[in-house]
């Protein structure tokens, strides 16, 4: 099962994701957490994501997916 929660900052995505993960026994993957961890560790994917974020652009799906697979 895959569930994607979309919304602006502060909309409650994290709260709802935690609720669903807990009650449906499914993993909770936060792209924001993935970005922050990779940027903090200065991984190649983190540097690439940061280059998009610094320009105010969305991080391409390919980069996000690669982080999730890592």
From Swiss-Prot:
Its EC number is 2.7.4.3. Pathway: Purine metabolism; AMP biosynthesis via salvage pathway; AMP from ADP: step 1/1. It is an enzyme of class 2 (transferase). SUPFAM superfamilies: P-loop containing nucleoside triphosphate hydrolases. Residues 30-59 are annotated as: NMP. It comes from the Bacteria. Signal peptide: none annotated. It catalyses: AMP + ATP = 2 ADP. GO terms for cellular component: cytoplasm. One of its GO terms (molecular function) is ATP binding. InterPro entries: Adenylat/UMP-CMP_kin, P-loop_NTPase. One of its GO terms (biological process) is AMP salvage. AMP binds at residues 31, 36, 57-59. Keywords: ATP-binding, Cytoplasm, Kinase, Nucleotide biosynthesis, Nucleotide-binding, Transferase. Consists of three domains, a large central CORE domain and two small peripheral domains, NMPbind and LID, which undergo movements during catalysis. The LID domain closes over the site of phosphoryl transfer upon ATP binding. Assembling and dissambling the active center during each catalytic cycle provides an effective means to prevent ATP hydrolysis. Monomer. Catalyzes the reversible transfer of the terminal phosphate group between ATP and AMP. Plays an important role in cellular energy homeostasis and in adenine nucleotide metabolism. This is Adenylate kinase. It comes from Streptomyces scabiei.
């Amino acid at each position: 099962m895959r569930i994607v929660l979309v919304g602006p900052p502060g909309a409650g995505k994290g709260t709802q994701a935690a609720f669903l993960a807990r009650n449906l026994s499914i993993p909770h993957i936060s792209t924001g957490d993935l970005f922050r961890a990779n940027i903090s560790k200065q991984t190649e994917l983190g540097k690439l994501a940061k280059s998009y974020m610094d320009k105010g652009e969305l991080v391409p799906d390919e980069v996000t997916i690669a982080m999730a697979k890592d």
